[in-house]
UniProtKB/Swiss-Prot annotation:
It catalyses: (6R)-5,10-methylene-5,6,7,8-tetrahydrofolate + NADP(+) = (6R)-5,10-methenyltetrahydrofolate + NADPH; (6R)-5,10-methenyltetrahydrofolate + H2O = (6R)-10-formyltetrahydrofolate + H(+); (6S)-5,6,7,8-tetrahydrofolate + formate + ATP = (6R)-10-formyltetrahydrofolate + ADP + phosphate. This is C-1-tetrahydrofolate synthase, cytoplasmic. The N-terminal methylenetetrahydrofolate dehydrogenase and methenyltetrahydrofolate cyclohydrolase (D/C) domain carries both the methylenetetrahydrofolate dehydrogenase and methenyltetrahydrofolate cyclohydrolase activities. Its main location: cytoplasm. It comes from Pongo abelii. It comes from the Eukaryota. One of its GO terms (molecular function) is formate-tetrahydrofolate ligase activity. Trifunctional enzyme that catalyzes the interconversion of three forms of one-carbon-substituted tetrahydrofolate: (6R)-5,10-methylene-5,6,7,8-tetrahydrofolate, 5,10-methenyltetrahydrofolate and (6S)-10-formyltetrahydrofolate. These derivatives of tetrahydrofolate are differentially required in nucleotide and amino acid biosynthesis, (6S)-10-formyltetrahydrofolate being required for purine biosynthesis while (6R)-5,10-methylene-5,6,7,8-tetrahydrofolate is used for serine and methionine biosynthesis for instance. Residues 310-935 are annotated as: Formyltetrahydrofolate synthetase domain.
């Protein structure tokens, strides 16, 4: 018969590499910034191992795979190797890796333990027990196949001879080649015989094979006469034998006597140049396949998420009973369901986690989802259910309409939790769970704000004290101490010198005048705006005297405590867009003025770097879930009066990327639309650059009755009779407030959906009236909602209306230009949003407007600090007040956060405890550790 056709592994592997190169190019085009990653871990420094690795690195480079060669010394222990493997398992830029064998270490290392530490989804060498088990079971699409057997199969397929029904003989049973080759041929429908060192009559067994794969490691063991005529022969051997004709005195031969075998076989692989090049090509193919699987798993699209079914009961159980009736899914599972990588999530137990900002970097090329803001009409003191509506809406969009959806809400302060308000995490069957975690410490963010804020406060008073009690020289020497005879400025001090126009870096070269300017902030105590904070309601800290200890040498001053969430640091964090931006904002925070009227910042105090360290974890959003299993970001909780009252930009941005272009992110703005929504647009959206798609405006029958002239509503007291009996006239009269808030929302060019939050005392006629009037006066739609009693199903109509509204044309626009004078910006808000005739700047406010403009802060947006109980400055005026002049008694600056806040009336920044605080009902069961009485 004619000599066998040569299966040239070099040529075939070159074709495979060319195909892989094209695939990698396409992947990079489809996903900008993405590159398949391969890592090769070497223990020791064997020459042969380095040679093999270099071949793989070169192949990866040609294809476009980012390959990394990790070298560990011979002193490496088994635990150190496994630790490194664990880090590669969690590295999302590495899609496949292998451990080069043998392990060359002076320590005893269990190779099996090391190999099995590799995550199966990254086991591109196919050597883990899981990969072997799946191959043995025939799960070829759910495992990686060892590269040499995989290459052998490709060579066999290259012949064009069908494998199915053929008798295949595999000589050798190693874990790397022989055993997996048997399984691979078996699941390609061959009848397979495996031979080994104990096989009797090996020549007879070999002679039965239509397909023969030899991997024994013994030179030319299989003779040509053993081979069945016309067989396909795949020789995996690489052996060195003496040859005087070769310059190095040896030659390479396979496990088959090639010259004899090629006279009987129909196809045969040469050695070298047969199987060897295919092994490397298959490693590259598996790496590209792993990268594709990674992209498939984390590509934009519908989440594979498991929702929780609610067990609705009547009469309605308490909020806490409802919360505890639904077991949250493990938060790590939820994180995976929504497309977060393990290294992007820091678990805080089973029900809460922090999400790293690296997720935003990874997803930066993904289009954003639809952005929805939930706001409300001017509320009663009881609140109208914005948080409950936010949760109900996302449950409807996710668990019922199967959309990717995220809620982004503020973190509540602990002060009101133990004071008059009680817990807050939505309500009824629309809650964030577990509510105990939501309302208490969560992940410690507010404690971090408190520590950072009070560090600034301590720095202010300490600096005043030291400047009052030391000479310029002594002060300078302590600020720039001599270490081993050398004085050196810190980085933050060099930045201060540059701001002062002193272009020097050597402390010894400063003049006396420069030392004075550098060392003295010369803070005017009367101008200090920075207060200490505490996350507890404590009325007796509203005004205090500090510095009364003898050690302070009589340097006392009057000060106060605010509640922690009133801190500018909280507002700054919520408007931060990155870690670098947060560092800059913290440095810009103005805490006082000097006696010359110059602003003194946290950067001047030298404390901004330390603040960033304290806040490095607080910048990461907190991941929780709703009762029905949809994801929630809980992050930041600034006041809605002296601050902007919105959750963080960072949480919104990460959520918008995670949901993808067809998904929804629903966030809530504090208080009514005239306050929280206006600040959401003019401050938060201005800084984030995000454009909202829909406004959801929450209204209730009881609130409209109040605005229509109903009796006073008081928290803690039963509702008057007018609120629980049908009164269409009162509802229609009070609709004026809802109409005005619809107009306010539409002023920004965004479609408005009115959510009529229904209570059991409301009648259908009242609810229908509100919906009809809303549509007649500009709302895109208005729907009745029963999500408190029914969960997501009760907000289904609302969710569908939001979907339609998100597709409607919109033209988002801000209300004012930042370049306008401060007074004009205030006037625009007062007239257009509140309906005032004009504003009146009282002397202190006029003075502050001039000072801040002179200091360079006049171009900041305006954050109005006004009562939330009326469109006017008078909380007793309901409906739509007219003919009033809005008095501005003062203007203050949150320069780090990035806004000026005019004060309309008096704002309390430290709540007090009532006669009977909520803490009377709160306790812990010592046996179950269950929190009772929180709400």
């Amino acid at each position: 018969m004619a000599p066998a056709e040569i299966l040239n592994g070099r040529e075939i592997s070159a074709q495979i590499r060319a195909r892989l190169k094209n695939q990698v190019t396409q992947l990079k085009e489809q996903v900008p910034g993405f590159t398949p990653g391969l890592a090769i871990l070497l223990v020791g420094n064997r020459d042969d191992s380095n040679l093999y690795i270099n071949v793989k690195l070169k192949a990866a480079e040609e294809i476009g795979i980012k390959a990394t060669h990790i070298k560990l010394p011979r002193t490496t222990t088994e635990s150190e190797v496994i630790k490194y493997i664990t880090s590669l398992n969690e590295d999302s830029t590495v899609h496949g890796f292998l451990v080069q064998l043998p392990l060359d270490s002076e320590n005893s290392i269990n190779t099996e333990e090391v190999i099995n530490a590799i995550a199966p989804e990254k086991d591109v060498d196919g050597l883990t027990s899981i990969s072997a088990g799946k191959l043995a079971r025939g799960d070829l699409n759910d495992c990686f196949i060892p590269c040499t057997p995989k290459g052998c199969l490709e060579l066999i397929k290259e012949t064009g001879v069908p494998i199915a029904g053929r008798h295949a003989v595999v000589v050798g049973r190693s874990k790397i080649v022989g055993a997996p080759m048997h399984d691979l041929l078996l699941w390609n429908n061959a009848t397979v015989t495996t031979c080994h060192s104990k096989t009797a009559n090996l020549d007879e067994e070999v002679n039965k094979g239509d397909i023969l794969v030899v991997a024994t490691g013994r030179p030319e063991m299989v003779k040509g006469e053993w081979i069945k005529p016309g067989a396909i022969v795949i020789d995996c051997g690489i052996n060195y034998v003496p040859d005087d004709k070769k310059p190095n005195g040896r030659k390479v031969v396979g496990d088959v006597a090639y010259d004899e075998a090629k006279e009987r076989a129909s196809f045969i692989t040469p050695v070298p140049g047969g199987v060897g090049p295919m092994t490397v090509a298959m490693l590259m193919q598996s790496t590209v396949e792993s990268a594709k699987r990674f992209l498939e798993k984390f590509k934009p699209g519908k989440w594979m998420i498991q929702y929780n079914n609610l067990n609705l009961k009547t009469p309605d159980p308490s909020d806490i009973d409802i919360s505890r009736s639904c077991k949250p899914k493990p938060i790590g599972k939820l994180a995976r369901e929504i497309g977060l990588l393990s290294e992007e999530v820091e678990l805080y137990g089973e029900t809460k986690a922090k999400v790293l900002l690296s997720a935003l970097e990874r997803l930066k090329h993904r289009p954003d989802g639809k952005y929805v803001v939930v706001t409300g009409i001017t509320p009663t003191p009881l609140g109208e259910g914005k948080s409950t509506t936010t949760v109900g809406l996302v449950q409807a969009l996710g668990a019922h309409l199967y959309q990717n959806v995220f809620a982004c809400v503020r973190q509540p302060s602990q002060g009101p939790t133990f004071g008059i308000k009680g817990g807050a995490a939505g309500g009824g069957y629309s809650q964030v769970i577990p509510m105990e975690e939501f309302n208490l410490h969560l992940t410690g963010d507010i404690h971090a704000f408190t520590a950072a804020n009070n560090l600034v406060a301590a720095a202010i008073d300490a600096r005043i004290f030291h400047e009052l009690t030391q000479t310029d020289k002594a002060l300078f020497n302590r600020l720039v101490p001599s270490v081993n005879g050398v004085r050196k400025f810190s980085d933050i001090q060099i930045r201060r010198l540059k701001r002062l126009g002193i272009e020097k870096t050597d402390p010894t070269t400063l003049t006396d005048e420069e030392i004075n300017r550098f060392a003295r902030l010369d803070i005017d105590p009367e101008t200090i705006t920075w207060q200490r904070v505490l996350d507890t309601n404590d009325r007796f800290l509203r005004k205090i005297t500090i510095g009364q200890a003898p050690t302070e040498k009589g340097h006392t001053r009057t000060a106060q405590f605010d509640i922690s969430v009133a801190s500018e640091i909280m507002a700054a964090l919520a408007l931060t867009t990155s870690l670098e931006d947060m560092r800059e904002r913290l440095g810009k925070m103005v805490v006082a003025s000097s006696k010359k009227g110059e602003p003194v910042s946290a950067e001047d105090l030298g404390v901004s770097g330390a603040l960033t360290v304290l806040m490095k974890d607080a910048i990461k959003p907190n991941l929780m879930q709703t009762l029905e299993g949809t994801p929630v970001f809980v992050h930041a909780g600034p006041f809605a009066n002296i601050a902007h009252g919105n959750s963080s930009i960072i949480a919104d941005r990460i959520a918008l990327k995670l949901v993808g272009p067809e998904g929804f992110v629903v966030t809530e703005a504090g208080f009514g639309a005239d306050i929280g929504m206006e600040k959401f647009f003019n401050i938060k959206c201005r800084y984030s650059g995000l454009c909202p798609h829909v406004v959801v405006l929450v209204a209730t029958v009881r609130a409209l009755k109040m605005h229509g002239g109903g009796p006073t509503v008081t928290a803690g007291l039963p509702l008057p009779k007018a609120y629980i009996e049908e009164n269409l006239e009162l509802v229609e009269k009070g609709f004026s407030n809802l109409k005005k808030q619809i107009e306010n929302a539409r002023m920004f060019g965004i479609p408005v959906v009115v959510a009529v939050n229904a209570f059991k005392t409301d009648t259908e006629a009242e609810l229908d009236l509100i919906s009809r009037l809303s549509r007649e006066h500009g709302a895109f739609d208005a729907v009745k909602c029963t999500h408190w009693a029914e969960g997501g199903n009760g907000a289904l109509a609302l969710a569908q209306a939001v979907q339609r509204a998100a597709q409607a044309p919109s033209s988002f626009q801000l209300l004012y230009d930042l370049k306008l004078p401060v007074e004009d910006k205030i006037r625009i808000i007062a007239q257009k949003i509140y309906g005032a005739d004009d504003i009146e700047l009282l002397p202190e406010a006029q003075h502050k407007a001039e000072v801040y403009t002179k200091q360079g802060f006049g171009n900041l947006p305006v954050c109005m600090a006004k009562t939330h109980l009326s469109l006017s400055h008078n909380p007793e005026q309901k409906g739509v007040p007219t003919g009033f002049i809005l008095p501005i008694r003062d203007i203050r600056a949150s320069v780090g956060a990035g806004f000026l806040y005019p004060l309309v009336g008096t704002m309390s920044t430290m709540p007090g405890l009532p006669t009977r605080p909520c803490f009377y009902d709160i306790d812990l069961d010592p046996e179950t550790q269950q929190v009772n009485g929180l709400f």
